[in-house]
Structures are given as structure tokens and as C-alpha cells.
Amino acid sequence: MEKPSREAFEGNNKLLIGIVLSVITFWLFAQSLVNVVLILEDSFNTDIGTVNIAVSITALFSGMFVVGVGGLADKYGRIKLTNIGIILNILGSLLIIISNIPLLLIIGRLIQGLSAACIMPATLSIIKSYYIGKDRQRALSYWSIGSWGGSGVCSFFGGAVATLLGWRWIFILSIIISLIALFLIKGTPETKSKSISLNKFDIKGLVLLVIMLLSLNILITKGSELGVTSLLFITLLAIAIGSFSLFIVLEKRATNPLIDFKLFKNKAYTGATASNFLLNGVAGTLIVANTFVQRGLGYSLLQAGSLSITYLVMVLIMIRVGEKLLQTLGCKKPMLIGTGVLIVGECLISLTFLPEILYVICCIIGYLFFGLGLGIYATPSTDTAIANAPLEKVGVAAGIYKMASALGGAFGVALSGAVYAIVSNMTNIYTGAMIALWLNAGMAILSFVIILLLVPKQNDTQL
């Protein structure tokens, strides 16, 4: 049978299912380790610090490399990069489950981060190329279900699989899903940019980005232990500022930059990406609230997780609703509505001073609003970012957008945890949780303002 040409090919459900399955290898499977930290500590006979490195390094490496890989997808082929990403996930999963050596666990998790960096921008670019109009919005809705929905379910999923089958089955199932995704994507004609010349990859930009982000991550997670007046803290801060400044200068001069700052001349794209960074940052809410109810109210892990059931359900339901609102109201109104609803939910969850029964009620309602808001926001935001990117740079644009997702989540969790720990030590855990949750509410409010100012009422989308 003759393989369909790119010009004749239209995206179908088979390809879309393959794309969604490839996306959940990160957002559902790789992220589910957040709920099995203690089990990993025993299985690998190592300390909690090593396990925490293994858990966090996947999102960090995904965020650091996703932009560069987005550019490679534009140049060398988006189907090719998606397949490479899926194969990397299989390799990383195998390294994690074949032994009890902590080093292999960390290497496997690192490879899974690179896998996610390949899959996320490449699959968004495939949707941009092969799905048009309402079909594209529908495809983005399912892509969002894989990412936002996967991240919402991952904690329960990881705990359930680890309890019923053993934690290694998380990655055995991930390998099976990866093989199915490869089969479903097979036969799709390649899509790449025709106008981008194959210039030398921006190694300098990548190195500077890695140095900057690693320095910032250490400052946030270890800053209170190091002390703001310590030589190491000051050195890391200087490295972060210096590498960031040099990165900006070199990227503006580069002929083939890692991050094309010209994309940010489009206000709609800038608004979608910046708000996406901040709303992924409010993932710190889950860490702070779950820790608080366990330590402050004496809840078990299962009881704490049950409070957020309304979030998991609503985010999955409302993503398709967000798609319909996008089609009827445009991008801006659903993004504002979603963010506004999320702010209400965040404020309810932050009421840690209430009596236990009242707080539990506020949490359940708050998580409902939290999931409802994120679900409404997800598809319009993704559509705004992708629709406002030039076709020849959609891989880079998608890479930057998903870098904002990964880094927003990574730094949001780190910053929320740091604020919670510092304020709790200075006062008590009730105040510590409230202030940390207010930080998340502040990020959501800033996201609302950015959408209000930057995203136009009617986007001049490039369908």
C-alpha cells in the first residue's frame, strides 16, 4: 500500500490516540513517582535525598531541553522526534526496573526527561500540521487531557499500581503504552519545516540555559539551608544572573538561537506562554495542601488524596468544555474565566485557620474550582500559543510553551515547598501552609492580569 503524502494526509483518530498515549508516558507514568518515594527509598536501599533527585530530575531535564528539541523537530522531522522520544522512554523505563542501583534510577529518570522534551513539542507540531480548525481544537483538547489530566491522576495512579502490582509495574505499563503509541503513529508521513536551513545547533545557548536553571533550582530548594549570606549562595546567585544575562545577549545575536525571542513579539503567544508558566506553578498547591493535612490534621496519604478527587474529576471533564468555549467565545474569555475560577479555588484551599470540618469542606469545594478552572483554561491557552506561531517555527514555539509548563511546575513546587518550610519553622504549620498557598494564589492572579493585558479579544490565528 502506498504511503500517503504529507499534502494528502489529514489527521485521524488513530494518530491522535498515538499522540495522547505518547504524551501520558510523561504526565501520567513518569510523574507518578511523586507518590512512591518511600517505597523507592526501600527498594534502592538509598536515602530520601537521592530519591528526591530521581523524582525531580525528569521534569527539570524536560524543561531544560524541550526548546532545543522543538527546533530539531522543525528541522529534522516531527514524526521522527516523536518516535525517538517514545523509544527513549522505553529505554529509561528499562533502566529503572532492571536493577536496584540508585545510579541507574537517576539515569533512567534523566532519559525520561529527554523523552518528554522530544515528545511534547513534536506532537503539538504534528497537531498544528495535520489538524485544521475545529479538528485541531478537538485534538488539542485530547492532548490537554493527556497532559493536564495525566498530571492530575498521576498521584492516585502511582499509588494504586504500586499497592496492587508493585511500583515497577508503573514502568512496565509505560513500556507497553509506548509500544502501542509507536504502532499507532507508524505510517504517518513526516512533517518538517521547509524554510528553516539546517544551521548548527545552538550549543552555547543550551549550556547557558542549563547552568542558569540548575543554579536557580539549587537556590530555591537549598537556599534556606545554605543561608543567604553564605559564599555558596552568593556564588550560585551570581552564576544564575550572569548566565541569564549572557544567554539573552547571545540569543539575540545568534543566527539560529535556541529560543527565538522574535516569537514574543506576538502578544497572544506571550500571554499564553507566560500565563501557562504561572498556572503550572500553582501545582505547588497540591504539595503544600497534602503535606499540611497529613502533618497538621493527622490525615493518612489516602485521606489527603481523597480531598482532591473533585480536582481530578473536574479537570478531565472541563477540558472538552474549554474546547467548546474556545469555539464560541474565542481564546481570551475562557482563559480569563478559567483562571478566575482557579483563583477562587486557591483561596478556599488556603483557609487553614478554619476548624477541621469547615476546612475539609472548603478543600473539597476549592479543589473542584481548581480543576474546573484549569480544565477551562487548558485548550484555549494551548490553541492560542500554537495558532499564533508561524508554521515554520511551530516546533520551537511549542517547545517554549511546554518548557513553560515543565519549569513552571518544577519551580512552583520548589518555591511553594521552600516558603512552607521557612514560614512553618518561623511560626507554625497552619500559617506556613496559608502563606505558601497565598503565594500560589498570587501566581494565579498575576496570570489573570497577563491574559487580560496581552491576549487580544479576537486572535489573528494562523489556521
From Swiss-Prot:
Family affiliation: Belongs to the major facilitator superfamily. TCR/Tet family.
SUPFAM superfamilies: MFS general substrate transporter
Organism superkingdom: Bacteria
PROSITE patterns: MFS
Xref: PANTHER family: MAJOR FACILITATOR SUPERFAMILY MULTIDRUG TRANSPORTER MFSC
Membrane-related topology note: Multi-pass membrane protein
Gene that this polypeptide is encoded by: norB
Chain segments annotated as transmembrane: 19-39, 53-73, 86-106, 107-127, 142-162, 165-185, 201-221, 230-250, 273-293, 299-319, 334-354, 357-377, 403-423, 435-455
Protein's name in the database: Quinolone resistance protein NorB
GO CC annotation: plasma membrane
Pfam families the UniProt entry points to: MFS_1 (PF07690)
Source organism per UniProt: Staphylococcus aureus (strain bovine RF122 / ET3-1)
Stated role: Multidrug efflux pump that acts independently of NorA and is one of the factors that confers resistance against diverse quinolones and chemical compounds.
Protein location: Cell membrane
Any GO MF annotation of the entry: transmembrane transporter activity
InterPro entries noted in UniProt: MFS, MFS_dom, MFS_trans_sf
Principal subcellular localisation of the protein: membrane
GO BP of this protein: response to antibiotic
Keywords in alphabetical order: Antibiotic resistance, Cell membrane, Membrane, Transmembrane, Transmembrane helix, Transport
Entry keyword rRNA-binding: no
